[in-house]
Amino acid sequence: MGTLQNGVSGWYARLDRCLDNREQQIDIWLSTWEKSLRSFQPIAALLPEDWPTLPANLLTDPGHVLDHLLARHDAESDGRSPRGAHPTPPRLADAVICSEMKDNLVNPKKPVQQSNFLMSNLPPGFRQHVEQLNLPKATQDNDVDDNAEREAVEQNKRTLSGIPLPVADTAAGGGLFHARLIRRHADAHQDADPELQKEDTRRLFSNIQLLDVDPLVVKSTKTRLLLESIRHELVSFGPETPGKISREEMEALLDAGVMQGDALQGEWPWTAAPELVLTNPPWLRIKDRFRGMEDGSQLRKELGERLRNLTDNGAPRFSTMRGNVNLYRLFIERSLQILKDGGRLRIIAPDSLLREQSSHPLRELLVKHHGWTHAWAIEEANLLFPGMTQGVVVLGITANGEAPALNLHGPITRSDLRKEGEGLSSRVPVFQLIEDRWTSWSRDTWAVPRLPRDRMERSHTLKVLDRLAELPRLSDEEHPLTTNQRQVRVRVGEIDQTAHAKNI
């Protein structure tokens, strides 16, 4: 259903039949995008004639087409089918970004206007009733200290537009998160002082950190961020102009802020630790890497050994590696190491992380050593990622912080995502998972339950979980099914019957 709604999946397949060189596809797309910006013509009118007709819903966001092409390139480089490649939806990226933004300081807050309506104009009965209500007078919101926030701007800890700095991506892909930040930054500076915008734009691009292992991705990301900035009138094609920095300066800032490297195995190339990491790393097991290569088996074995042997200050870099290691779990642990203390990680991952046994060490790390504050549960992910059957979770974690409870948001649907406020509709149910209750449910595995959206069903589910938590588990010695001091074992959802064959 998601693929039909998307309506564009066939365009990429037709493009592959027309031109099967992915690098050339990306190069032509980016150069045509630049021509479109220079000539103020639609990008579809400038594409080569032998390219398939561009669907209408791809005309408005050229960056999303680049994300698709890079996702297909990434899949093919590992020998996987490009049909299973799913770039991050811009709508989800916008919601995630929104949840971590600070107050906009570009335009000063307007004082709350007091009503000039006189109480004496009300009839006596109404006036007496209003006086009994004892309504408070409207006051200015003082939750945010503007002076402290402006000082943070001067120290390059944030932008006037509300973006925490430095802001990083440990698996940049096409730079989607930073491209959406550019859009948000430009919107915040709309109708603002041009010189203020220019100064804040320099501040932003002097404090971006994007890393990716693929040289084609790095090159494409630099071009994409340049074109996005030109599109949103933050950068000029030539020399510096009012409100816009020059292209030459922007390219120098991008060379310093977008680099090629391996975030998992290498060192973080920037000296300043990021304040915020926004990322959607590869959802790929090590055993699925290098499938299209002759010596893929040996390469996988060597990669696994290298990752297990990596150390920092004598301690393993990845302390939670278990079973069939999935790369997104390593990116979570590595991103938390890179962040400054108190920095925030927002990462998109499969929702199996919340419950699978092999992720138990990682969940324990997040609870015991960091502040795991949020989990957005998106169960109907096929409406966001066309063709995907797996659920998605967006984690919110404070590096080396503490969290009194995990705020579990969901189930979330596509229509719940927002570009303002906290990124989610107020209709989305929120459940605070307190540590004591969490422990009694999961017996220290820190598994997160899947809760229904309906209020009555949710209440019933919580009561059932509380009741089940008091009963012995199948693997407990005191369970009634334990015979001859041998507990029932569960494998992949089925009871192991070998120990009880005589009694069946």
Set out the residue ranges of the language-model regions.
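Short, glycine/acidic-rich hinge or "gate" loops at secondary-structure transitions
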Residues: K110-N121, V235-E248
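Signature of N6-adenine DNA methyltransferases within the class I
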Residues: M1, P87-L92, N147, A172-G175, ...
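Conserved SAM-binding strand-loop segment of SAM-dependent methyltransferases
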Residues: A256-G261
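Conserved SAM-binding loop
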Residues: T221
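Short beta-strand element of Class I
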Residues: I208
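A short, structural micro-pattern
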Residues: R202, A252, M388-T389
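Class I S-adenosyl-L-methionine
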Residues: M1-R203, L211-V217, D262, E267, ...
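A general structural motif
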Residues: G162-P164, F205, A273-P274, G342
